Structure formats: structure tokens, C-alpha cells
């Protein structure tokens, strides 16, 4: 079993390092959805995005805010991170 957990951890770490610099979606526990360029992520899932937009996740994903500076998202609120396919 320990081999499986080790493999899963390395796959997750590899995914996270591969998406740095790419456009991602980050969903928070509050239902807010952020999209932007992933600048950094740490072991606590704290996320820094640039060129970010903030949406409330719904059928129409209504735009709430567009940020001209970096956005920092606290890892305890992050539900998931996914690479945005263009």
C-alpha cells in the first residue's frame, strides 16, 4: 500500500509543477471560481494567480471581478485546481 500512496503523491506533485505558468481554474469552497495564470503553489495548496478573473460558479459563470494584480488564494479554501483547456 505504501508504494501506491507514494506513486499517487508523485503524480500529484508532477501535475502541479507542470501547470505552473499555465492558465488554470481554481474553485473555492465558497463557490467562487478563479481563472488566471498560475504563478505559484505550495504544499498547503496556497495559490498565486496573475491576470485573474473571479466568477460565481453557476450555469452562466457570471463575471464578478477582473484583477490587474496578483491574486492569492488560501489553500484551506481550495476545492480543486484544473488546467484550463483552450
UniProtKB/Swiss-Prot annotation:
GO terms for molecular function: RNA binding. GO terms for cellular component: Lsm1-7-Pat1 complex; nucleolus; nucleus; P-body; sno(s)RNA-containing ribonucleoprotein complex; spliceosomal complex; U4/U6 snRNP; U4/U6 x U5 tri-snRNP complex. InterPro entries: Lsm6/sSmF (IPR016487), LSM_dom_sf (IPR010920), Sm (IPR047575), Sm_dom_euk/arc (IPR001163). Changing residue 74 to A: Reduces affinity for poly-U RNA ends. Belongs to the snRNP Sm proteins family. SmF/LSm6 subfamily. Component of the heptameric LSM1-LSM7 complex that forms a seven-membered ring structure with a donut shape. The LSm subunits are arranged in the order LSM1, LSM2, LSM3, LSM6, LSM5, LSM7 and LSM4. Except for LSM1, where a C-terminal helix crosses the ring structure to form additional interactions with LSM3 and LSM6, each subunit interacts only with its two neighboring subunits. The LSM1-LSM7 complex interacts with PAT1; within the complex PAT1 has direct interactions with LSM2 and LSM3. The LSM1-LSM7 complex interacts with XRN1. Its main location: cytoplasm. It holds the Pfam family LSM. The keyword Hydrolase does not apply. It comes from Saccharomyces cerevisiae (strain ATCC 204508 / S288c) (Baker's yeast). GO terms for biological process: deadenylation-dependent decapping of nuclear-transcribed mRNA; maturation of SSU-rRNA; mRNA splicing, via spliceosome; rRNA processing; tRNA processing. It is found in: Cytoplasm; Nucleus, Nucleolus. SUPFAM superfamilies: Sm-like ribonucleoproteins (SSF50182). Keywords: Cytoplasm, mRNA processing, mRNA splicing, Nucleus, Ribonucleoprotein, RNA-binding, rRNA processing, Spliceosome, tRNA processing. Component of LSm protein complexes, which are involved in RNA processing and may function in a chaperone-like manner. Component of the cytoplasmic LSM1-LSM7 complex which is involved in mRNA degradation by activating the decapping step. Together with PAT1, the LSM1-LSM7 complex binds to osmotic stress-activated mRNAs to attenuate the osmotic stress response, probably by limiting ribosome access to the mRNA and consequently translation. Component of the nuclear LSM2-LSM8 complex, which is involved in spliceosome assembly. SMART domains: Sm. Residues 11-86 form the Sm domain. This is LSM complex subunit LSM6. It comes from the Eukaryota.
Amino acid at each position: 500500500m505504501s508504494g501506491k500512496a507514494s506513486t499517487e503523491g508523485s503524480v500529484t506533485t508532477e501535475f502541479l509543477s507542470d501547470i505552473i505558468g499555465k492558465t488554470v481554474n481554481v474553485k473555492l469552497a465558497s463557490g467562487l471560481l478563479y481563472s488566471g495564470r498560475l504563478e505559484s503553489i505550495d504544499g498547503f495548496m496556497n495559490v498565486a494567480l496573475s491576470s485573474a478573473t473571479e466568477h460565481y460558479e453557476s450555469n452562466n459563470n457570471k463575471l464578478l471581478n477582473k484583477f490587474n494584480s496578483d491574486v492569492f488564494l488560501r489553500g484551506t479554501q481550495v476545492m480543486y485546481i484544473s488546467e484550463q483547456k483552450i
